């Protein structure tokens, strides 16, 4: 999920759509599912427009950025649907930016509730340049090696969902916040500096400008076709254990949405069996429905990549409560205030 500047993309009705296709639905989304031609979003938006006559207007930004935009528009909402990632979806719920809505697929989706639902499974990952490094860094300690000075970069916690995930993963891998922050303080000696975008780091790794960066599994798998020098890895802790934070795409209905009914229709459409079955084929993601198991090669590759890696997730509500304080502490320990 790279963090790009907000960009407005209008996905217009197909030529074959009915003449009554004047209604719209506006989506504020973290990116990653609209990358490249024939993406999952593009295919589903086109199919939705054809089926309903409703045009999809798409606004893209970082996980925290799209929520901040919703907050600024609280008195005059412009969006109908929000797609972001934890802990930003929990922040949106806590700030009462989301409306109550139980989706048609709720019973088939673990962790769905009356305010938001997982949309696509995803996981924190790391990438390295396999042309310049014979093997991936085996452990977190390896990343402190001097050879990575100014050759390592991760996106900024608080701005990018993936960057926030790096901070949380450090807490988990080192056993506590204190130990995680201590490590990130040391790692800063090798870090190139802040990056508002996770996705742009992939090209830098591919070109060898940096050797290592953070990312997420869905995005990195999709990008590897265009970036042949990039490979995925997960560093091990001092016990030799590799783990990956689960950071799903999550969808919710915006409180006070101008086209609330259209928003509900789109959410149900994206969570349908038909749409979920194609998310790996088109965008390398994994479906969230318990009754959908794709058989395409992308799905097989994604599941194979996670072999030997333990997935985990924190109590996201607790993370959302302490996020501002944790981000402030991150800036302090990395001297990036």
From Swiss-Prot:
GO molecular function, one term: thiamine binding
Superkingdom, natural source: Bacteria
One GO cellular component term: outer membrane-bounded periplasmic space
Keywords associated with the record: Periplasm, Signal, Transport
Gene3D superfamilies the UniProt entry points to: Periplasmic binding protein-like II
Signal peptide: 1-21
Location of the protein in the cell: Periplasm
Keyword Transport part of the UniProt annotation: yes
Main location (coarse class): periplasm
InterPro entries recorded: AminoethylPonate_ABC-bd (IPR017637), SBP (IPR006059)
Biological-process GO terms, alphabetical: thiamine transport
Similarity comment: Belongs to the bacterial solute-binding protein 1 family.
PANTHER family tied to this protein: THIAMINE-BINDING PERIPLASMIC PROTEIN (PTHR30006:SF3), THIAMINE-BINDING PERIPLASMIC PROTEIN-RELATED (PTHR30006)
Functional description taken from the UniProt entry: Probably part of the PhnSTUV complex (TC 3.A.1.11.5) involved in 2-aminoethylphosphonate import.
Protein name (record): Putative 2-aminoethylphosphonate-binding periplasmic protein
Gene name linked to the record: phnS
């Amino acid at each position: 999920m790279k963090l790009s500047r907000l960009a407005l993309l209008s996905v217009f009705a197909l030529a074959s759509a009915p003449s009554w296709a004047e209604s719209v639905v506006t989506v504020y989304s973290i990116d990653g599912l609209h990358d490249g031609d024939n993406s999952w979003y593009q295919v589903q938006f086109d199919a939705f427009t054809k089926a309903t006559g409703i045009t999809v207007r798409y606004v893209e930004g970082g996980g925290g950025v799209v929520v901040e935009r919703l907050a600024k528009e609280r008195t005059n909402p412009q969006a109908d649907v929000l797609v972001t990632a934890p802990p930003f979806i929990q922040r949106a719920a806590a700030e009462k930016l989301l409306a109550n809505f139980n989706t048609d697929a709720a019973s088939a989706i673990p962790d769905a509730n009356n305010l938001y639902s997982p949309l696509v499974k995803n996981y924190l990952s790391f990438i390295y340049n396999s042309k310049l490094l014979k093997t991936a860094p085996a452990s977190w300690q390896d990343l402190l090696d001097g050879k990575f000075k100014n050759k390592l970069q991760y996106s900024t916690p608080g701005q990018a969902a993936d960057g926030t995930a790096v901070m949380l993963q450090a807490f988990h891998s080192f056993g506590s916040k204190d130990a995680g922050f201590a490590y990130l303080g040391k790692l800063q000696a090798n870090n190139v500096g802040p990056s508002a975008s996770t996705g742009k780091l992939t090209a830098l790794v591919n070109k060898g400008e940096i050797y290592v960066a953070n990312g997420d599994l869905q995005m990195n798998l999709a990008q590897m076709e265009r970036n042949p020098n990039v490979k995925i890895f997960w560093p091990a802790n001092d016990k030799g254990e590799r783990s990956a934070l689960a950071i799903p795409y999550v969808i919710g209905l915006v409180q006070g949405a101008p086209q609330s009914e259209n928003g509900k229709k789109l959410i149900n459409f994206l969570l349908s069996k038909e749409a979920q079955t194609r998310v790996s084929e088109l965008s390398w993601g994994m479906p969230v429905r318990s009754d959908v198991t794709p058989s395409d090669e992308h799905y097989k590759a994604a599941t194979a990549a996670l072999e030997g890696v333990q997935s985990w997730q924190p109590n996201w509500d607790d993370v959302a409560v302490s996020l501002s304080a944790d981000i402030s502490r991150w800036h302090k320990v990395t001297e990036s205030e």
